[in-house]
Amino acid sequence: MYMELYPDKIKGFISIDSAPLQKSYMTAMEIWLLERAEPLYKIYPWKALLGAGSRGCAETDYGQNLMRKMMMSYDSDPREYARLAGFGYRMLAEAIKADLPYRISCPALLICGERDKAGSAKSYNKKWHQREGLPLKWIKNAGHNSNTDQPDEVNRLIEKFFSEVDGKGVSG
C-alpha cells in the first residue's frame, strides 16, 4: 500500500514467498476464504493446526521448529492465534478487493520456495513473473518460509539485489 501511495519514495521491492495484491490474480473463492480464515482456524483442532502450520510453511527441521515455536506462544490461547491470523487474512482480502493497480515502478525481486505449499503462493509468483516481467528466484529445498529453510541463499539474493540497486545510483 505504501508503494501505491508514495511510488517516488521506493528504491526497491523484494517479495519473499508472498503474492501480488492485484485482484486479477485471485479467484472470488480465494478472496472469500481469506475473509473467513478466523472461524476456520477456531474450529481446527489446535494440535493438528500446530502440525499443519509448521509442516505447511517450512521444509527443513529448522524452519518447522521456528514456526512451531511462534505458534506455541499462543498455546494458552489458540483463539487469539485464530483472531490474529484471521485479521491478517482479512486485511489482505481488503487490499485485494480495493482493486488498485499496485504498480511496481522500481527494481524488484520475487523470491519463492520451490516447495511452497501455502495457498496458491507458488502459482501466483509464476503468474506475477510472467505478467509483470519481474525477476523470480526459486529457492531449492524451501517451502513458504524460504528465508527460514534456506537463509543463506535468501540473504545472498537480497544482498546481491541491494548492491545492484545501489550500483545504479537510484536515489531514495
Language-model segments: which ranges?
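Hydrophobic residues on the short alpha-helix immediately C-terminal to a glycine-rich phosphate/catalytic loop
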Residues: 2, 18, 157-161
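Flexible "cap/lid" loop of the alpha/beta hydrolase fold
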Residues: 4, 10-43
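Short, structured coil segments at secondary-structure junctions
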Residues: 9, 104, 130-132
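Active-site loop signature of alpha/beta-hydrolase-fold enzymes
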Residues: 21, 118, 145
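Conserved alpha/beta-hydrolase catalytic His-Asp/Glu region
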Residues: 24-26, 43-103
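Short aromatic-enriched loop/helix-cap "lid" or pocket-rim segments at secondary-structure transitions
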Residues: 24-29, 122-124, 149-151
